[in-house]
């Protein structure tokens, strides 16, 4: 009997020892696994504050970049700016190429659990073209039936050529065939909106993290509407969440490159843009990644506010007084190149000859450096306006690089045009955009990056009725060329190209704006950060497939 008891006790002890050993082994294995699996968290910088998370009202690259990562549309761009299906699962185009029937995936949801439906697109697009919304990107809808008439207040929003032909099917009616329409469908302004949430918050929708709903890979948290730091968290409701590896992205607005570099060196930033003096110093850094970018920096004149700026000779004098080569070599130093015109080199080529658009559209003696001629033309323009000198203020964003560019322009223009008294005002980017939209400026230093790979994305900006044209510049020949490209020549590839080249030449000859340089993108990227997709057309970064290795 005692032997039996001893045997049972021994067996029990052995079982306990085995269990304890198993627990210890499991813990060690788990610890080793945890130690070998890096935390899927990255730290990034932003050059400016978020202006809005409302897709119908955004007008700046940083806010668009944020929306690209928290929302999703029918298509998404790859690194070359080519659209691929996202929420769309099937696209059927009619024989005359004017009707698009698009099936939408059934498993897409908003971050509040609501399903993403065809009606969400209908509501979003109707809201965007409604003149009450005052969306800055209404031109993207111009190919859709009745869009322009609705935006001009001539028709009701219900007449827009988009309908839900089922819970998960969208039917789009175009005015005419448009070869680049799929690229337009990938733009953020054409993403869907959850009507219930937008109606709940009204005008406050998109003004903070908590007053926005998301359907993309991440959700925005911690943005109050005015602060300079926020987070992107993995969206548990995202339909394709299995491809999303990052759990958290920490963003911080950093306007001084030196501050960003210090943080990068100490491991507190995983990716940072390189500009100015840093570009030269870090040229051989093994973390440096160089990328082309379809973006142009330019001076915009407010001819409605300052009458003298409506004088062509004054504008041409200002343009010829700027040494663009010196600007990119001594201030930017990041591979940016002087711009002869608005449409950047390397984006579009003549369908017949293969010649680059920028080269074909260049106009002599409009963007070269000629201080002697600049002085003569400026003086001539002043005389025509009955003035002895001109005093204006250049409005610019207050990040370090933009301030340096503004100061350079002030220096070179003051030197070459003694009759020009130019002062500089630098303010937060979001405030600057608001002032420009409300025409509260004399001169403005601003940039535009392509919405898609076609010259029209730049040239459409300066038609007389464009919502982006706050300058007051208007030219009938320019308007006609753009109109022809969008209508009578829309299906004739070469004729359309010729229309756009003509428009670009008119803009350059008249100096409706003064282009400065084509931007280039350079970043320091930590070797452990993989899978970031950079779109060289619009300059956006997608973290959907990014991960820490």
Predicted regions, residues:
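Extracytoplasmic/peripheral linker and loop segments enriched in polar/acidic and small residues
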Residues: 15, 419-432, 460-526, 549
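N-terminal lobe/hinge region of extracytoplasmic solute-binding protein
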Residues: 46-95, 213
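Surface-exposed binding/hinge segments that line
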Residues: 137-196
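Gly/Pro-rich hinge or "lid" segments in bacterial periplasmic/extracellular proteins
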Residues: 174-244, 248, 258
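Ligand/substrate-recognition segments at binding pockets and active sites
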Residues: 225-227, 369-450, 521
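Ligand-site clamp/hinge motif
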Residues: 236-280
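Structural transition elements
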Residues: 338-380, 401-403
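Long beta-strand-rich cores associated with HINT superfamily self-processing modules
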Residues: 523-549
